Amino acid sequence: MRVSRNKLILSVLLISLALAGSASASSVTMTYQGHQGVVAKDGSPYIGYPYYVSINGSATLTPLMCDSYDNNVSLGQTWNATATPLLQGIANSMFGPAMTLDYKAAGLIFKSMLGGQMSTTAAQWAIWGLFSANASSNAYFISKNFGSIDAAYLTLAATASNSAFKGLVLYTPTGGRPGVGPQEFIGYSPVPEPGTLTMMGTGLISLAGFIRRKLARS
């Protein structure tokens, strides 16, 4: 009987820990499904965002922003990646922690685009330009002055609070590096407030204590 009680309590505690750690890194399988009818805009030579991807075989496609201009994926290609909250994922990202400010700027640009504050074309090229000299020296990039967007958002990123990056997810391809392997992507996935996760975890731990006391009386 004691073994069963201990197993029950342990199970509840493990559930609470899993919930508390739900925002950590996870390994995923990604399959590129194209742009789903979206076309290049404003004279851009490339479509860019959105790259629609099936994650772990899901029939619901996820629209993602590419940050690696010099890498490529082909329609139907499948690869493994690590999905991590943006700030946490920078340490093991494609471009590394030396580019932390650039990743932060990319995250802010992406959120601004999602909020309707800039076009998808401008956001895509600005993010490409942060990480690739080939992108930032492209005639189209220069003609549209996307470098001014980068400069503005690098300044914003320098003082932005961590909460500004909430919900951003970095998808880093396994074994990928600049110019080699699949692209790295940034996505957005609303997550529960940290306080909510803490309350859920605390509640489950309290429940475990309650169960333990009830079992002790039986």
Functional labels for PLM-detected ranges:
Residues 2-27, 183-208:
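Short, threonine-centered small-residue motifs that mark membrane-proximal processing/anchoring sites
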Residues 4-6, 110, 165, 213:
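Generic cytosolic/nucleocytoplasmic N-terminal low-complexity/intrinsically disordered segments
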Residues 8, 74-76, 198, 218:
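A broad, structure-centric signal for solvent-exposed, well-ordered loop/edge residues
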Residues 17-24, 156-159, 215:
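Residue-level detector of intrinsically disordered, flexible termini
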Residues 26-189:
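Short, surface-exposed polybasic-aromatic patches that bind anionic ligands, especially phosphate groups
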Residues 51, 192, 213:
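A contiguous, well-structured "functional interface" segment within a domain
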Residues 208-218:
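C-terminal membrane-anchoring or membrane-association module
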